[in-house]
């Protein structure tokens, strides 16, 4: 069985590389399918997490997004990573993002299996259950960075702007209303037809989610105050593939 797995591995590496490059908009210089991927053992995953500061993890994500948006993702042996991480996990960051199919965090940040915790919900809102998951990721599993990632043209944001009512979705969209109400001074209609308004609400929603995480979790707030973690926000642009990190004031030291 191991022999059969090894025969498929080069094809998986190449297919994954080409797939990510295609998603990112492609560059004129794609990675060669013969490039040798980094093969980390579990100790390497653990070392990377333990020795990284929150600032270094943030820089790692930024560099990964640059590779993705430029169409130059790192080659990966996903079968190897899957086998290695079956014995444990040491993700460096936890990403709270929308369920939108066009915004997968591992691709956007050019990360691999075992590198990120993912918490996904329409509109990337922060509720008690999701914040509890972040507490596990950081306090128990050792992640150094919490990222709230919104994105452009978000359907949940548009729904909140239009005050859509639809079953259980109604209650979820109500949680975005504070962001809608926060946005002032944008010219034009205050609904989904006005994309400038929609994007302003998306950013306000990210800011409020970061604030909400600190309010709901004394654990995470304390860890941030002690520089053990950082909590940041960003917006992913569906058209360019690039992430823009938002300047949000950190918890006072």
Language-model features, listed with the residues they occupy:
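Glycine-rich, flexible N-terminal cofactor/catalytic loop recognition
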Residues: 73, 81, 85-93, 98-103, ...
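Loop/turn elements at helix/coil->beta-strand transitions in domains of secreted/extracellular proteins
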Residues: 92, 142-145
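Short helix-loop-beta junction
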Residues: 109-118
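Conserved functional hotspot residues or short segments at active or partner-binding sites
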Residues: 148
